[in-house]
């Protein structure tokens, strides 16, 4: 059983909405490219910006031709068929140009893709034709990038391993950063277990403009019967001295003094941002890696939900602080479904 504190609406209503990507097609029945920029923090209105970019598009394979060996093979452009959709996160860089120049450079990229496997399935991106607007990101683009397949591809099983695959960029998601920089809570701190402590988790409720059931993301009904999605993130631990009694009022007062402000960004698809505008205890501040603004990309928190809603309209409709007993340190975490050292199973 957990106790809940509901944050007031003003804490998320200003920047808690993301507009959808418009899916429009041209005369060739192909999607018209579009760039969507959202601001997090207080970035400058003009001039140099720090932009985090996520390229969205389609995985395509060459269509099989029936007139092999004809002269037309040399003159006609290769046609492609779509085999899936996905994304390519290219990170943060300092950008000087316009949005349309950036969109043109992104759609002109030649990106080849390979599906492979390590400990899990991976997608390999190799990039060519990097235009001048993308030079701030060229260090990453030229080296090639590898990502967890379940984070960047909606259906990685649809990508063939015996055919050439290209990634055609159609949309660009950009997050313009101001004083709020991208700071993630380190995994070691997020997994921290302290005795005699209360875990402070945030339950974020979203409303989206698309139906998600057919893609495997089941909504829940709120008190008004509206369909909502939700996810949880870990903020930190509240610890009291031995002998002190925890109470809901004590935990709520700690949270209220932080004066948290919430917003949505487009880092990795959809991202949840938390800014501390009030006071923090030293213990809590250390758990936030001494940052007053942290980012939770949904790509890391709930990859499948992120893949389904990253092009849709998304709105925060509620944020709750959930106070739960911290997981005891002697509880073991099992990241694998196969138990080791049992029967014939031995750890390599």
UniProtKB/Swiss-Prot annotation:
The UniProt entry's GO CC annotations, sorted and at most eight, read: host cell cytoplasm; host cell plasma membrane; membrane; virion component
Record's subcellular location: Virion; Host cytoplasm; Host cell membrane
Xref: InterPro entries: Matrix_C, Matrix_N, Matrix_Paramyxo_C, Matrix_Paramyxo_N
Q: Which UniProt keywords apply?
A: Host cell membrane, Host cytoplasm, Host membrane, Host-virus interaction, Membrane, Phosphoprotein, Viral budding, Viral budding via the host ESCRT complexes, Viral matrix protein, Viral release from host cell, Virion
PTM comment: the record says: A large portion is phosphorylated in the cytoplasm, but not in virion. However, this phosphorylation is not essential for virus replication.
- Alphabetized Pfam families for the sequence: Matrix_Paramyxo_C, Matrix_Paramyxo_N
- MF-aspect GO terms: structural constituent of virion
Positions carrying Phosphoserine are 70
Oligomeric state and interaction partners are given as: Homomultimer. Binds to the cytoplasmic regions of F and HN proteins. Interacts with nucleocapsid. Interacts with human alpha-tubulin and beta-tubulin. Interacts with host ANP32B.
Record's family? Belongs to the morbillivirus/respirovirus/rubulavirus M protein family.
Can you quote the domain comment?
Answer: Late-budding domains (L domains) are short sequence motifs essential for viral particle budding. They recruit proteins of the host ESCRT machinery (Endosomal Sorting Complex Required for Transport) or ESCRT-associated proteins. The matrix protein contains one L domain: a YLDL motif.
Q: What does this protein do?
A: Plays a crucial role in virion assembly and budding. Forms a shell at the inner face of the plasma membrane and concentrates the HN and F glycoproteins. Acts as a negative regulator for transcription and replication by sticking to the nucleocapsid. This effect might be regulated by the cytoplasmic interaction with tubulin that dissociates the M protein from the nucleocapsid.
Name listed for the protein in its UniProt record: Matrix protein
């Amino acid at each position: 059983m957990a106790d809940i504190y509901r944050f007031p609406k003003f804490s998320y209503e200003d920047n808690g909405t993301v507009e959808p990507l418009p899916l429009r097609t041209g005369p060739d029945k192909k999607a018209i490219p579009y760039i969507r920029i959202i601001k997090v923090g207080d970035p400058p209105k003009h001039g140099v910006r720090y932009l985090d970019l996520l390229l969205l598009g389609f995985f395509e394979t060459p269509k099989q031709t029936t007139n092999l060996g004809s002269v037309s093979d040399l003159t006609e452009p290769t046609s492609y068929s779509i085999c899936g959709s996905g994304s390519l996160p290219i990170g943060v860089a300092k950008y000087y140009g316009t949005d349309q120049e950036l969109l043109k450079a992104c759609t002109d990229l030649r990106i080849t893709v390979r599906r492979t496997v390590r400990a899990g399935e991976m997608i390999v991106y190799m990039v060519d034709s990097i235009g001048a607007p993308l030079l701030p990101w060229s260090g990453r683009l030229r080296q090639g990038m590898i990502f967890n397949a379940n984070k960047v591809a909606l259906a990685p099983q649809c990508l063939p391993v015996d055919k050439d695959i290209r990634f055609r960029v159609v949309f660009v998601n950009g997050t313009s950063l101001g004083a709020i920089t991208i700071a993630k809570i380190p995994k070691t701190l997020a997994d921290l277990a302290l005795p005699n402590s209360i875990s402070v988790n945030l339950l974020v409720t979203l409303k989206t403009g698309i139906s998600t059931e057919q893609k495997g993301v089941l909504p829940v009904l709120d008190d008004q019967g509206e369909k909502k999605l939700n996810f949880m993130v870990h903020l930190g631990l509240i610890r009291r001295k031995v002998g002190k009694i925890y109470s809901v009022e004590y935990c709520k007062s700690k949270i209220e003094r932080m004066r948290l402000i919430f917003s949505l960004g487009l880092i990795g698809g959809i991202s949840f941002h938390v800014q501390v505008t009030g006071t923090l205890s030293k213990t809590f501040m250390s758990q936030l890696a001494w940052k007053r603004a942290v980012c939770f990309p949904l790509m890391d928190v709930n990859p499948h939900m992120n893949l389904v809603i990253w092009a849709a309209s998304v709105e925060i409709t509620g944020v709750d602080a959930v106070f739960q007993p911290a997981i005891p340190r002697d509880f073991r975490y099992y990241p694998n479904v196969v138990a080791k050292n049992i029967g014939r199973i031995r750890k390599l």
